Amino acid sequence: MQGRLSAWLVKHELVHRSLGFDYQGIETLQIKPEDWYSIAVISYVYGYNYLRSQCAYDIAPGGLLASVYHLTRIQYGVDQPEEVCIKVFAPRRNPRIPSVFWIWKSADFQERESYDMLGISYDNHPRLKRILMPESWIGWPLRKDYIAPNFYEIQDAH
């Protein structure tokens, strides 16, 4: 079984892999980093005009990093908008994924947080810098192989 976007991508010979459907019937697609930007543009033109959320996670120590995009096709007069989840996996050594900021502006802070916490570089992002951690911070705190520095915060006693 294929979702509508997946069927459309197959029809137009665009490389992707269906990872199945979740409990709400939303299909998850796997896209290669080098194909992501063109498929993102195509998804927008197809009608996925809203990036509901973007997040990232570390699959396993030493494994791939994943950037996840939840897209929604919002149309006037439609009670159940069509949704799709897209996962882009990147190698840990040099995790680079094209930014979709220029397609969906809501990707701005979300991609920055994924960069800050996991070290995924989003190519062509206009302000890719740390958003939660200080600029001087070393490492990527949400990676499973991250080793926390040995320091203690001094707090007021009163």
From Swiss-Prot:
Cystine residue pairs: none
Subcellular location field: Plastid, Chloroplast thylakoid membrane
Reaction catalyzed: a plastoquinone + NADH + (n+1) H(+)(in) = a plastoquinol + NAD(+) + n H(+)(out); a plastoquinone + NADPH + (n+1) H(+)(in) = a plastoquinol + NADP(+) + n H(+)(out)
The entry's keywords: Chloroplast, Membrane, NAD, NADP, Plastid, Plastoquinone, Quinone, Thylakoid, Translocase, Transport
GO molecular function terms attached to this record: NADH dehydrogenase (ubiquinone) activity; quinone binding
Top-level enzyme category: translocase
GO BP annotation list: photosynthesis, light reaction
Pfam families assigned to the protein according to its UniProt record, in alphabetical order: Complex1_30kDa
UniProt topology in membrane: Peripheral membrane protein
InterPro entries: NADH_DH_suC, NADH_quin_OxRdtase_su_C/D-like, NADH_UbQ_OxRdtase_30kDa_su, NADH_UbQ_OxRdtase_CS
UniProt EC number: 7.1.1.-
GO annotation, cellular component aspect: chloroplast thylakoid membrane
Origin superkingdom: Eukaryota
Summary of subunit composition and partner proteins: NDH is composed of at least 16 different subunits, 5 of which are encoded in the nucleus.
Role summary: NDH shuttles electrons from NAD(P)H:plastoquinone, via FMN and iron-sulfur (Fe-S) centers, to quinones in the photosynthetic chain and possibly in a chloroplast respiratory chain. The immediate electron acceptor for the enzyme in this species is believed to be plastoquinone. Couples the redox reaction to proton translocation, and thus conserves the redox energy in a proton gradient.
Family: Belongs to the complex I 30 kDa subunit family.
This protein's name: NAD(P)H-quinone oxidoreductase subunit J, chloroplastic
Gene name of this polypeptide: ndhJ
